From Swiss-Prot:
PANTHER family hit by this protein: PHYTOCHROMOBILIN:FERREDOXIN OXIDOREDUCTASE, CHLOROPLASTIC
Enzyme superclass (EC): oxidoreductase
Role summary: Catalyzes the four-electron reduction of biliverdin IX-alpha (2-electron reduction at both the A and D rings); the reaction proceeds via an isolatable 2-electron intermediate, 181,182-dihydrobiliverdin.
Family matches, as InterPro entries: Ferredoxin-dep_bilin_Rdtase, Ferredoxin_bilin_OxRdtase
Keywords: Oxidoreductase
One Pfam short name: Fe_bilin_red
Reactions mediated catalytically: (2R,3Z)-phycocyanobilin + 4 oxidized [2Fe-2S]-[ferredoxin] = biliverdin IXalpha + 4 reduced [2Fe-2S]-[ferredoxin] + 4 H(+)
GO molecular function, one term: phycocyanobilin:ferredoxin oxidoreductase activity
This protein's name: Phycocyanobilin:ferredoxin oxidoreductase
Length: 245
């Protein structure tokens, strides 16, 4: 599935968002057997207005034998705001963490960059193979680390949440996301299905992750302003953080 022929919103966004979107799809295509994941047609590409500015949202979704949904969302509000949002939702038959990554930028500056492989175990532990691989990564030092939100206890100890203050720090963040993705894809390929009992624990952990993410007031407020409360609720719970059955 070649993507090079499809024009993308990323061409109009901050360079780090374009680079990160390209990186995510490149690693996915390199390691995983992708097939399309079909969103409702009206939610693949959405346009609205926010405080007089045009709001555009572009969604791309895939699935694989190990992941029920791999979602890459790009959003742009006029020249004020650029957003990248990505989550990989594992199938609950596999004991895999949740990869999540967000970039928020505006007026040429990235104000927030977060990436994590978040545990689905309710005791907040990652699978041993992940713990080992992530521990072996170089320690990164960013000049402007940021504080996680109140609901941020879903994230792992390896989570990066920063305001990159230079091109060098942007490159560091991009490199770390690539490493997270490579660890994750290799972990997924090596994973075996779990027992029915373990699957129930994993489902509970994924539900906890999604319900905490749905509490993100900033995302909800932007969507409500542009499209109304009902639309925002539907988008939050069917596109961004739908709960596994």
């Amino acid at each position: 599935m070649s993507l090079t022929s499809i024009p993308s919103l990323r061409e109009q966004q901050h360079p780090l968002i374009r680079q990160l979107a390209d990186c995510i799809e490149e690693v996915w295509h390199q390691h995983l057997d992708l097939s399309p994941y079909h969103l409702p047609a009206e939610l693949g590409y959405v346009e609205g207005r926010l405080e007089g500015e045009k709001l555009t949202i572009e969604n791309r979704c895939y699935q694989t034998p190990q992941f029920r949904k791999m979602h890459l969302e790009l959003a742009k509000v006029g020249n004020m705001l650029d957003i990248l949002h990505c989550v990989m939702f594992p199938r609950p038959e596999y004991d895999l963490p949740m990869f999540g990554c967000d970039l928020v930028g505006g007026r040429g500056q990235i104000s927030a960059a977060i990436a994590d492989l978040s545990p689905v175990h309710l005791d907040r532990t990652l699978p041993a193979s992940y713990n080992s691989a992530l521990t072996n990564l170089d320690t990164l030092n960013f000049s402007q680390p940021r504080e996680l939100p109140e609901w941020g206890n879903i994230f792992s100890d390896f989570c990066i949440f920063v305001r990159p203050s230079s091109p060098e720090e942007e490159a560091m963040f991009l490199g770390r996301v690539r490493e997270f993705l490579q660890v994750h894809c290799q972990g997924a390929i090596a994973a075996s299905p779990v027992s029915a009992e373990q699957k129930q624990h994993i489902l509970a952990g994924q539900h906890n992750y999604c319900s905490k993410q749905q509490q993100n007031d900033k995302t909800r407020r932007v969507l409500e302003k542009a499209f109304g409360t009902d639309w925002a609720e539907n988008y939050m719970t069917t596109v961004l953080f739908d709960l596994p059955e």
